[in-house]
Amino acid sequence: LTYHYEGFVNDENASVLDLEPEIFTTANDASPAGEYPITVDGGFAENYHFHYLGAELIVGAGAQHIDLFAVDANATYGDQPLQIEAEATSGLPVEFASSNPDVLEVNGTQLKIRGAGEATIYAYQEGDANFDPANELNATIVVHTAELEVIAHFSSKAYLEPVPELTYHYEGFVNDENASVLD
């Protein structure tokens, strides 16, 4: 904090002061963003009457960024939810959004796999009274299709007999799905 003088006469300067003024504010290193008064008081000189003009200390919002953002880039339909890790330098919580919730749905710090395809996951921190918003980060994740096997059943017939009805079954459905989901 600084101050200056106005009003010395006869080419005098601060060297004529018997007691220099003190300057202070109510803000400290941990004060949240806002405006704080700066006051000056306590000066004395035999030939001068002091008139103090205060000012304001403006504590602005601090910068922050997301310095950790980790998520698997590949998954397969039917896998367990993916975990997302992210931290902001402010310590504020990082939030997430999906460009394609039909593929990956955000649920807190997990991504629920809803279907095969591609989705971009965005990590963001909007800030608060003490921190500006962080720049958004993103990662594209590919969810591969699950393997579904169609297995033909063995069958037999006698010569010149009609071909019996041929049958098959599926193996590999995930998420309690069955043949009703096939197009």
Predicted regions and their residues:
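Solvent-exposed beta-strand/loop surfaces, strongest in extracytoplasmic domains of secreted
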Residues: 1-183
